Regions:
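N-terminal, active-site-proximal structural segment of metallo-dependent hydrolase catalytic domains
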Residues: 1-47, 57-63
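Active-site-proximal beta-strand elements of phosphoester/diester hydrolases
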Residues: 1-9, 98-108, 142
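Active-site beta-strand/loop signature of hydrolases that rely on acidic residues for catalysis
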Residues: 6-7, 23-41, 101, 130-153, ...
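Structured beta-strand-rich core segments of catalytic domains in phosphoester-bond hydrolases
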Residues: 37, 42-109
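Metal-dependent phosphoesterases centered on the DNase I-like endonuclease/exonuclease/phosphatase
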Residues: 51, 122-205, 209
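Conserved beta strand-loop-helix elements of the APE1-like EEP
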Residues: 60-75, 200-221
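Active-site beta-strand termini and strand-to-loop segments that position acidic
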Residues: 70, 94-97, 215-216, 234, ...
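Surface-exposed cleft-lining segments at the edges of enzyme active sites
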Residues: 81-82, 106-123, 159-162
């Protein structure tokens, strides 16, 4: 099974044809999209054979997530376990039979770090949500987690802990996920990748913000994990995970 996670930075700005062309090249079984910036009725993508799950933000042109899957979900729900309303459209959880899939778009702390308290609370809620799911069966978390936990992921930035996505608190949130038993699939497959090998278009390596994290007991199912820097249309690269 091939899964793709991609922050598309606006569904309407990418346009259907560009997205369809990218999907044809990626040829995946599951697409997890972040920052769709859609509201209901604004142009969902209809892929033959795929089930589409769309989570909208209340605020127009903001946030939003989607899952398009060939495997019909047993069920899906929005938000974290403590926030079923998810007014910002940030999280979709889908039961795909032998594992849970969680597609997430983490809050950005803002350039002045003014939203850092919100982000800390969100990180804590995400961890509790994942732990509750993982107690039942394995979990794959993917998405734009807006945090670079590895020093190698911050390319060409000297401000260190004052850079959004690289603050001590955000890195601690990522560390908590990894310490709780989740594994960074990209780093598992490519432990010795040189810094900046997959550069996020604004200066941070793609894997420095965008991830596939899997339950430790799913590691043996990982076949491959990669980024796709040649796929254009967004300021993020699509990330890929292949499992058996």
């Amino acid at each position: 099974m091939k899964l793709i996670s991609w922050n598309i930075n606006g569904f309407r700005s990418l346009m259907n044809r560009t997205l369809l062309d990218a999907f044809a090249r990626l040829d995946a079984d599951v697409y997890c999209l972040q920052e769709t910036k859609l509201q209901a009725g604004q142009g969902e993508l209809d892929l033959p054979g795929f089930t589409g799950i769309w989570n909208y933000a209340d605020r127009p042109g903001y946030s939003g997530t989607a899952v398009l899957t060939l495997r019909t979900p047993v069920f899906s729900r929005f938000g974290l376990c403590e926030d079923e309303t998810d007014t910002q459209g940030r999280v979709i959880t889908a039961d795909l039979g032998d594992f849970y899939l969680v597609n997430a778009y983490a809050p950005n702390v803002a350039a002045d770090l003014s939203r850092l308290p919100e982000r800390i609370a969100w990180n804590d809620a995400l961890l509790r949500h994942l732990q509750a799911l993982d107690a039942q069966k394995p979990v794959i978390l993917c998405g734009d987690l807006n945090a670079a936990y590895n020093d190698a992921d911050l390319a060409g930035k000297s401000q260190g802990m004052h850079v959004p996505g690289f603050t001590r608190e955000e890195r601690s949130g990522m560390a908590a996920l990894l310490q709780s038993g989740f594994v960074d699939a990209y780093r598992y497959v490519h432990p010795d990748t040189a810094p900046g090998a997959f550069a996020y278009r604004k200066g941070i390596r793609a894997g420095g913000l965008d991830y596939f994290l899997v339950s430790a007991r799913m590691v043996e199912r990982i076949v491959d994990a990669n980024a796709h820097p040649r796929i254009r249309g967004s300021d993020h690269y699509p990330m890929e995970l292949v499992i058996r």
